[in-house]
Amino acid sequence: MNKPVAPNSYKTGPDEEGMFGIFGGRFVAETLMPLILELQQAYETARNDPEFKAELNALSTFYAGRPSKLYYAEGLSKHLGGAKIYFKREDLNHTGSHKINNCLGQILLAKRMGKTRIIAETGAGQHGVASATVAARFGLPCIVYVGATDVERQKPNVFRMKLLGAEVKPVSAGNGTLKDAMNEALRDWVTNVEDTYYLIGTAAGPHPYPELVRDFQSVIGTEARQQILEQEGRLPDVIVAAVGGGSNAIGLFHPFLDDASVKIVGVEAGGRGLEGEEHCASMSAGRPGVLHGNRTYLLQNADGQILEGHSVSAGLDYPGVGPEHSWLKDSGRVDYVPILDNEALDAFQLCTRTEGIIPALESAHAIAQAVKMAPTMGKDKVMIVNLSGRGDKDVHTVGKLLGMDI
């Protein structure tokens, strides 16, 4: 197959219909279309309003703790014996992950639109916590849909949401994971369109969500680009991030897309291997289809039914991916690779012991790719890994898998 011709810029999408090439769009129930268009209009107005930008910037700085640091992971780099590895420390944000970046932007949008009720979906629980956090900060009721499987996997985060005043609704349909939680949230939205704002946590869903989530998360890459120029005097050779729905990854990637010298790698959940169905590598092993309002790469069976998938990481077990990632895969700009559960677990422990940093299992997938790549690169090469969240939420899962009683 011929490699596609590179566009003049990889940063111009989506078009006005929300398409990134053949991906994206607005495949929603008729009742939702007016709301989607209202949201798009509100976002267009807000993004061009200096007051909105100033308020978001102030909250990001004084509430969330931005900018997050770009940290030279010296212990890990020396252990691997190749490229210098830097961590973009999104784990240091308020609430412990990158999710707060998007939630602050969207809660300000909800306020502008006069919405009085917030709903959200969550897998790893980090988006649920961040949504409950911003709802508490602005005095709005918040309902968080969580797959029943994930309620069990993420007990500390479920308790945090409740502490913050959110109502947590377990979803037992399907496998009781992120896809099912998103289905329930969409059902809620359809029946409560007047007063409800759906605060989507990932760069998927109907347009304008993939675009606005990307824009709110792009602060990650914008900062990282500036920080690496200050610390190394040049751009990195490689940037790496884990991809579930893909918001932390697109946030890091987007500001680097037109830097041709920078190799970009997205890391999918390879689960127990791509041979069967126990993985969530939709771009490595899926094909295009429509889910949750957009056309993108999905895990499907021969009849087009969406597969449940599996990952040790609750935040990566989504059977699809944001449409911009699908386009970046097909355009050849970004390489997407799978990492197995056991590789992520090994990286989780290695990072903890060489750096004194406990990463989220999602981030551990990206670190596992760094473990593979860094030793093949020269010591003069530079890599940035997005440390998308901290791993406190995962210690019970990891303990169980390692046979330790916590």
UniProtKB/Swiss-Prot annotation:
Keywords attached to this Swiss-Prot or TrEMBL record, sorted alphabetically, are: Amino-acid biosynthesis, Aromatic amino acid biosynthesis, Lyase, Pyridoxal phosphate, Tryptophan biosynthesis
Spell out which residues are annotated as carrying N6-(pyridoxal phosphate)lysine. Answer: K99
Q: Where is the signal peptide?
A: none
Q: Name one GO cellular component term.
A: cytoplasm
Q: Which domain of life is it from?
A: Bacteria
One example of the protein's molecular function in GO is:
tryptophan synthase activity
- Involved pathway(s): Amino-acid biosynthesis; L-tryptophan biosynthesis; L-tryptophan from chorismate: step 5/5
Q: What is its EC number?
A: 4.2.1.20
Which PROSITE patterns does the record match to this protein?
TRP_SYNTHASE_BETA
Tell me the cofactors it needs: pyridoxal 5'-phosphate
Q: Which HAMAP family match?
A: Trp_synth_beta
Q: What is this protein called?
A: Tryptophan synthase beta chain
- Give the species: Brucella abortus (strain 2308)
Q: What is the lineage of its organism?
A: Bacteria, Pseudomonadati, Pseudomonadota, Alphaproteobacteria, Hyphomicrobiales
